Design a protein with these regions (language model features):
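Hot-dog-fold acyl-thioester-processing enzymes
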Residues: 1-73, 134-238
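Catalytic-pocket segment enriched in acidic/His residues
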Residues: 212, 219-265, 281-283
Length: 297
């Protein structure tokens, strides 16, 4: 894996099964995904292709042996909705590689385009490599049931909850939170069953020092995206951006609440762009995912 190395192309079919399986995995059954809204094309969840973009490395590398790498950071941009029946072409490239605290990190970018060459989405992923089963150097995270005994993190929220974004939305406004109960089936379906990993196989997870299979960090990102899709509407799918870091584990049985607060409003041509702080936290109040997001209004 060297900087500049190209990845792909790979093709992804956006069919009924893919849309509905993803809806189950992230517990988001918006009618726009399940049946389509009257007079409109049926679409998929905004983050429907997030795992496909993350695994564009499969075009060059076979990592079906259970290697337990850790996903550290994720950026995602939305340009156009993903529509039922499309064939999306994925391409990517490695853009950075570095060592920090004796661990190798690699960053790669990937994008999806439709049959007409229109950009649908773009992702930038950073992962910590080289954690094969049985050789995890860092202490294993506490099991989910133990995490619930920790003192909650302080979350300062003072503004009103605003259902829908507009040019008059004030700074400090809260986005309506999204609450999810995570089950093992969702974790496995989200990741896919084509390989054993710390997300799908208990034996592999325990060999890597984990107490249970662990949810992909991307799942928390999809929950935040759901909240922001409800808040912004179509401008989230056509101009939304999110950048998050995955800072604590999520296990089956956890309850995850995803929230956002409007931090700033900036001019963007004839429109404004709302900048938000975003995060997901477990039932103990421990943040598991943190970052920023924005979209035009």
């Amino acid at each position: 894996m060297e900087v500049g190395e190209e990845l792909g192309p790979m093709s992804v079919a956006v069919d009924d099964h893919k849309i509905k399986a993803f809806a189950y995995a992230v517990d988001d059954y918006d009618p726009a995904y399940m049946v389509g809204r009257p007079g409109r094309e049926r679409i998929g969840h905004p983050t429907l292709l997030c795992n496909d973009l993350f695994h564009v490395r499969k075009s060059k590398y076979d990592y079906t042996t259970g290697e337990a790498g850790l996903h550290a950071k994720q950026e995602y941009e939305f340009f156009n909705p993903v529509r039922l029946g499309q064939a999306i072409t994925l391409t990517g490239r490695f853009v950075d590689k570095y060592i920090r605290r004796e661990k190798t990190y690699i960053t790669f970018e990937a994008e999806g385009t439709d049959e007409d060459g229109r950009l649908v989405n773009r992702a930038r992923s950073t992962i910590m490599m080289g954690l094969r089963p049985g050789v995890m150097k860092e202490p294993a995270p506490a099991p989910a049931q133990e995490a619930k005994t920790e003192a909650p993190a302080v979350t300062i929220v003072s503004g009103p909850i605003v259902e829908r974004a507009s040019r008059s939305t004030p700074t400090g406004a809260q986005v309506k939170p999204v609450v999810k109960f995570i089950n093992a089936g969702q974790v496995v379906i989200f990741t896919g069953t084509d390989r054993r990993s710390i997300h799908t196989d208990l034996q592999t997870a325990r060999a890597a020092g984990l107490p249970d299979i662990i949810a992909q960090g991307l799942m928390s990102m999809t929950y935040i995206s759901e909240a922001l899709n409800d808040f912004f509407g179509k401008t989230w799918q056509q101009g939304g951006k999110i950048s998050v870091a995955f800072i604590a584990p999520v296990y089956p049985g956890d309850i995850v609440t995803s929230s956002a607060i409007v931090r700033e409003k900036v001019a963007e041509g004839r429109r404004q762009r709302l900048l938000l702080d975003v995060w997901s936290e477990n039932a103990a109040g421990r943040r598991v995912t943190v970052g920023t997001a924005s979209a035009p209004v």
